[in-house]
UniProtKB/Swiss-Prot annotation:
The gene is pckA. This is Phosphoenolpyruvate carboxykinase (ATP). Pfam families: PEPCK_ATP (PF01293). Its EC number is 4.1.1.49. ATP binds at residues 201, 220, 236-244, 285, 323, 448.
Amino acid sequence: MQETGVHNGAYGTDKFGLKNLKGVYWNFGAPQLYEHALKNGEAVLSSDGALVADTGVFTGRSPKDKFTVRDATTENTMWWGGNQSITAEQFETLYQDFLKHAEGMTLFAQDLYGGADPTFRIKTRVYTELAWHSLFIRTLLRRPERAELENFVPELTLIDLPSFRADPKRHGCRSENVVAIDFARKIVLIGGTQYAGEMKKSVFTTLNYYLPEKGVLPMHCSANVGPNGDTAIFFGLSGTGKTTLSADPNRTLIGDDEHGWGKDGVFNFEGGCYAKCIKLSAENEPEIYAASTRFGAVLENVVLGEIDRKPDFDDGSKTENTRSAYPLESIPNASLTGRAGQPKNVVMLAADAFGVMPPIAKLTPAQAMYHFLSGYTAKVAGTERGVTEPTPEFSTCFGSPFLPRDPSVYGNMLRELIAKHNVDCWLVNTGWTGGIYGTGHRMPIKVTRALLTAALDGSLRNVEFRTDPYFGFAVPTALPGVPSEILDPVKTWADKAAFDTTARKLVGMFQKNFAKFEAQVDAEVRAAAPDVKMAAE
């Protein structure tokens, strides 16, 4: 077997059970991985120097194909209401079949950290069949120094083989595509898909399992910090604006998607960003555009000009879920430490497909826990297979597919941290205004940015608020530079009766969804629920 690159020779492929490999490329950097991806026909080069790959059939995550081993370790610690199980025996069969499938292959291996805080990070080794997948995960996780690689012993190991085809009868899964996690052995198996985001989210899922026991709240959020050291957290599902809104030229970016919140503050799990880039433009998102049109960026399913090879970010013919992965260093004002102090503001982003939520509202701590557990948004086109237009969705903790433990574990931790650090909480609608999806229009990003700036710099504390008659939270009545009518959603609708009907419908959906949590929360949180009786008064 031919091995090239820096690694710990005493802890190689044999420790994972890999044998009869043709070769291993260890910890290659971007230039080498570009060369292999291009030589192997895995990807092409854009005119700007980005590496552009197609992910084939799977252009998004496939949550129904994700499984966790149910054993003595997980029986009473996993949230089985939200996770699918396989037996330890089925996983072992799958694992051995993965090892057999890898024989004769040349694999790419990366030794990386999941987490910027040395106390809580997890040492992660990722074996990939494809060179561009190796570049992707190297970009998204945190890269050790060269000297650290020579003694690196992984705690978590992923193997990613897109050419593997699972057998549902033999392996206990649903289809030929599979993501299987064994928390006791700290192994993740990914097969049958070329969608690179499965790797990143598998590491996130493992951190979501291990960190609460260490007193750290893992979060599906972005984070940034202002010039005065004021940290802000942005919760939200894919496509709601986490990446876009946290990339603020006046604030330092900590990270765009995954963080932990513990005794010393907030830390990024990652070393890169993974931005949706459909309709990406230099005018609306200059930093993300610049990071996506340069050497080192990995573009997924982006259409290139036939002759000039220029990315056409407006073309969603392959998928609406076009993506750009780039290192944090590509953002001019990104924090390279990936760490910041205790948050002063928590923002919950919702893409309201009904168009009845205000562009911003202030939440009490109880309302914050209610909306965190509710996790309301719209599923935005393309993030998952089969979703082509926004549909209302409740995804608890703004990340249901990635929660191994019961949502109340994360909800209670958030409430305690908000109270302990006296954090201001906001709900921001980045969805629709002027009508329901299809008749209204998307909230202007400039309005959202202006309102967020006012919230984060403290100026929103000094304005007059009204109580929303449907949702009960506090809504500003006026703010300089923002049209006052957009602050009150009913004023943006031509048909006021239709607004009332739609708002009541959404309130009912909130109540129906939250019923499953009522036994796990106290009276104060239950009282924070939206209530149609308010609207009738």
